[in-house]
Amino acid sequence: MADHSPIYVGLLFSVTGDISTIETSQLRGTLFAIDEVNQAGGINGREIVPIHYDPQSSPGLYRVLAERLILENKINVMFGCYMSSTRKAVIPIIERWNRLLFYPTLYEGFECSSNIVYTGAAPNQNSIQLAEFMMENYGERVYLVGSDYIYPYESNRIMTDLVRQRQRGEKVGERYVPLDATGEDFKDVIADIKDKQPHFIFSTVVGNSTQLLYRAYADAGFDPRTMPIASLTTLEAELAQMGKGVGAGHVSAAPYFQSIATPKNIDSLEKFRTRFGTDVVPNAGWEAAYFQVHMFAQAMQLSGSDAIDALMPNLLGMEFDAPQGRVRIDPSNHHTCLFPRIGIANDEGQFTIVREATRAVHPDPYLIAHSLGDWTVSLKTPK
């Protein structure tokens, strides 16, 4: 007799707190994909039923709620986390109970858990390309500003190493602000930037305080044509928070931008807006959250079980036609082959893509084999 019982999955995305904007978009991307799978008949006739908890942007709550999902809700698979501090809070729980986390966010690399599938960009899929683009087009003096937690520190270290590969590459300053930063926190940062006069600013500020940095930059009269902010974490959702025009001229790197003009992306955006409206802004985190659900569904369809030991042989090496292009989970490190892109923000709150990969770049979370100028990660100007 066929099993038609529901498949419960856990969702750990904050809808309150400092990272609520980006995680709400990831939550909606996840729910969108679950809807698509269920409307197509589910997984072997079984409906996916999400159990969502709001960790309120608190790493401690992610840990508590991950354990609740496992012990009380009996789930085997969860999707979630944006900040590295929240992912690291969850890792001991999923490893202790041998459960699976799909993590849909770029991060600093230098990690490989057998209980995680990483669908966001590794450093060789964004940092290298961004560093090369900025130094070729703006100059080799960088000022680093970030939020005060692990990802910005590690990402800034990587950017510093990349800049220093150039003979004249130089880090001229580095500052950090609280996750719940206010406008006051950026006054000293802006004053220091005025004093140091870098060629570009590399921002790893995350969450709802991102808009404050860009507004402070604009209020200071800085010009993005000569000293832009470059970022891996400022995407369409953050531009929408700032208001149109505030982020224009600044540069970001990501595998996905809404402006990708492929039939798959255009169709996905249209269906998403029809289902959920326009209050949530799709971005790279949204797209990774979306396609990882489909990859889970395909793997479970083959395995017949959501137990990690049954899923993993089918997940590793799996491919999927995502809005960014055809992605693949690398069997050697549980990370995903993605399509790096560089975008410059425009007045409409979107990104004009100025560089993009012609093929998927294999993830190298430990940056073992890559450096500036490496042909395997280089980008081309779109035709």
Name each model feature, range by range:
Residues G29-P50, Q167:
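Signal peptide-proximal N-terminal region
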Residues S25-Q26, I43-G109:
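Beta-alpha junction/loop-to-helix N-cap segments that form part of ligand/metal-binding clefts
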Residues I7, P323-K383:
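Solvent-exposed, acidic/polar segments of extracytosolic/periplasmic ligand-binding ectodomains
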Residues D54, F110-E132, G247-Y256:
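Short beta-strand elements at the ligand-binding edges of bilobed clamshell
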Residues L69-Y82, F102-P104, Y143-G146, K196-N208, ...:
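Periplasmic-binding protein-like
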Residues N115-D219, P263:
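Extracellular/periplasmic Venus flytrap/periplasmic-binding protein
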